[in-house]
């Protein structure tokens, strides 16, 4: 949902002179077009990508590792998350017409799945650290790790529900020039911001910095043809997280501590543009955490073949070659046991 909607039009316009009011009206028109369009793009891409990951994970890929457990829960959280975006897109163009119950429900669904996605990303990072740095121990305790992984995922969903209660309880529909779904309470907004910054940014960022630093050090001292590929993927994961999440979280932090920026129309543009960039994670997660796997890509081509699209795509030969290469690749136990991404 639009973070900007908690600070709606009337409050801004009252603090502006005539020139600033004209600029702000231009901004409101820009927001009315830009955010819904971005929401719909993220919705479509996230719906397709995360649905594919879920279908392949459930019907074509047995849960053989802790990473597999996480890669079922992550696209599920992202999928439910993006399914709330069409409602916010419509509300951005017009106003909130779905009532108070739907307001509370969608605020809860949106927030629960946001926290779940970020906490699972943190767990995936820690799991990769264990698989690479403690490879032998991780392999020998695979069954136990699978059990713990399911328990951890259940706990993540419960924790996400608990920390989302303020939005669910205090979420309401307000009439501020138009009907808005949100929470119009400064204390609640402060609590929500602190929780979002901690669980949704600083925790996964800290986990990535610590775990990936050790992983990189371990891989640099290791041999094998997987090293360079794994390092590239690590840097890609870190770069995508930093580029998509840092700007929006930085803007939210500035917004909460420097109220004078509220009189700057340029700052309002920054809020909604960085928000849209942050939501791209729901589209990119399937690529970063699933499609990098050779095993997953093999199962993807199986799905394409089963639904009858393979002959039309003209990739039957390539799919067969990819399948053979994947089988040859997976024959190496040592590589798979120590591979960070189980490629």
Curated annotation (Swiss-Prot):
Known role: Receptor for the C-X-C chemokine CXCL16. Used as a coreceptor by SIVs and by strains of HIV-2 and m-tropic HIV-1.
Regions of this protein lying in the Extracellular compartment: 1-33, 91-104, 166-188, 261-276
Keywords for this protein: Cell membrane, Disulfide bond, G-protein coupled receptor, Glycoprotein, Membrane, Receptor, Transducer, Transmembrane, Transmembrane helix
Recorded topology in the membrane: Multi-pass membrane protein
Superkingdom in the source lineage: Eukaryota
Name the UniProt record assigns to this protein: C-X-C chemokine receptor type 6
Upper classification of the organism: Eukaryota, Metazoa, Chordata, Craniata, Vertebrata
Entries under SUPFAM superfamilies matching the protein: Family A G protein-coupled receptor-like
A single GO BP: inflammatory response
KW Protease (keyword) present: no
Family designation: Belongs to the G-protein coupled receptor 1 family.
Subcellular compartments: Cell membrane
GO MF terms held by the record: C-C chemokine binding; C-C chemokine receptor activity; C-X-C chemokine receptor activity; coreceptor activity
Transmembrane annotation, as ranges: 34-60, 70-90, 105-126, 145-165, 189-216, 233-260, 277-294
Topological domain spans for side Cytoplasmic: 61-69, 127-144, 217-232, 295-343
GO cellular component: external side of plasma membrane
Stored InterPro entries: CCR1-9-like, Chemokine_CXCR6, Chemokine_rcpt, GPCR_Rhodpsn, GPCR_Rhodpsn_7TM
Positions glycosylated per UniProt: 17
Main location: membrane
Disulfide bonds: 103-181
Pfam families registered for this protein in UniProt: 7tm_1
């Amino acid at each position: 949902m639009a973070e900007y909607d908690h600070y709606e039009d009337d409050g801004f316009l009252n603090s502006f002179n005539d020139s600033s009011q004209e600029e702000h009206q231009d901004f409101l028109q820009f927001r009315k077009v830009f955010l819904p369009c971005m929401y719909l793009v993220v919705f479509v891409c996230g719906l397709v990508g995360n649905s594919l990951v879920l279908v392949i994970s459930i019907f074509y890929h047995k849960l053989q590792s802790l990473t597999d457990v996480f890669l079922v829960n992550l696209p599920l959280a992202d999928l439910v998350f993006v399914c709330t975006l069409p409602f916010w897109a419509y509300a951005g163009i017009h106003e909130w017409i779905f009532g108070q119950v739907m307001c509370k429900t969608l605020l809860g669904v949106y927030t629960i799945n946001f926290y779940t996605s970020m906490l699972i990303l943190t767990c995936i990072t820690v799991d990769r650290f264990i698989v690479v740095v403690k490879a032998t121990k991780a392999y020998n305790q695979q069954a136990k790790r699978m059990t713990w992984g399911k328990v951890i995922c259940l706990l993540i969903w419960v924790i996400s529900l608990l920390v989302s209660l303020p939005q669910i309880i205090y979420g309401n529909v307000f009439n501020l020039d138009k009907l808005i779904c949100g929470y119009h309470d400064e204390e609640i907004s402060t609590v929500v911001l602190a929780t979002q910054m901690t669980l949704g940014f600083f925790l996964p960022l800290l986990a990535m910095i610590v775990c990936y630093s050790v992983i990189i050090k371990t891989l640099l001292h290791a041999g094998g043809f997987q090293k360079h590929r794994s390092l590239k993927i690590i840097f890609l994961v870190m770069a995508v997280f930093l580029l998509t999440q840092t700007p929006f979280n930085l803007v939210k932090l500035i917004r909460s501590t420097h109220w004078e920026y509220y009189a700057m129309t340029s700052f309002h543009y920054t809020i909604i543009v960085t928000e849209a960039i942050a939501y791209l994670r729901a589209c990119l997660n399937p690529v970063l955490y699933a499609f990098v796997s050779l095993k997953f890509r093999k199962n993807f081509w199986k799905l394409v073949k089963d639904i009858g699209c393979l002959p039309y795509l003209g990739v039957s030969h390539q799919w067969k070659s990819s399948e053979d290469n994947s089988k040859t690749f997976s024959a190496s136990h040592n590589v798979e046991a120590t591979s960070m991404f189980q490629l």
